Amino acid sequence: MLRPKRSGESYQIEIGKTFGLYKSVWTDKRYDSNEYGTKLVNSLIEGSGFTFPKSLWAVYDPVEAVTGKDKDAIILDFFAGSATTAHAVMQLNADDGGNRQFIMVQVPAPIDENLSPYKRGFTTIAEISKERIRRAGEKILEGECHAGWKRDVGFRVLKVDTSNMKDVFYRPNGLGQQDLLDTVENTKADRTPEDLLFQVLLDWGVDLTLPISRGIVQGKTVFFVDGDALVACFVSIR
């Protein structure tokens, strides 16, 4: 049994009743990247194209050891790939009733048109990452879960993009007569109300994972973030 013990900004790993370092070489069958990596991913997404992704348990066990009793921990994987980390976090939550969250980062690296994933409709690695999370979540919900678990396998996809605003306030020396109307309506024409909402959330430092709903008030679409913690409407009044 591995249990973490915080020591300042680091952790000691408790093994049974003694302390020791985590093994640097894992030979248990559960860490086999073919059986619990390649085959597992292909069982969720046939022809995923990933060769020897990490074993689910090779991520699950360190996450369990490091987060320990902190069941609200946030786990960041800056190279999501086949999204093994997301799968492991959801599985661990299902096993111990935790509410850990994951942040997966993946560039939309294109997939070769001649490869199986492309022929199955996946054009980027990021698309496979997202689909693995969806299907892994569904599979976990079908299995045996901790009675106290919230059964939350949802996730939100955010993409890095340019600003929603026209570049009008950043060139004071270049402001001309033709730019004056842009100081009144400075939102780019192709941006949606959802785009504007998330820019507000970012600017105000609001948690991007909070629940968002929409309603109609006097014929206008209104967004409600976390109930009524933030209410926003992005309708131009002319």
Residue ranges and their predicted role:
Residues 203-222:
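Conserved helicase/translocase motor-coupling segment
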Residues 56-139:
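Conserved S-adenosyl-L-methionine
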Residues 43-51, 66, 75-78, 116-125, ...:
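Short, contiguous acidic/charged loop-to-helix segments that flank catalytic cores in large enzymes
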Residues 153-166:
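A conserved beta-strand->alpha-helix junction
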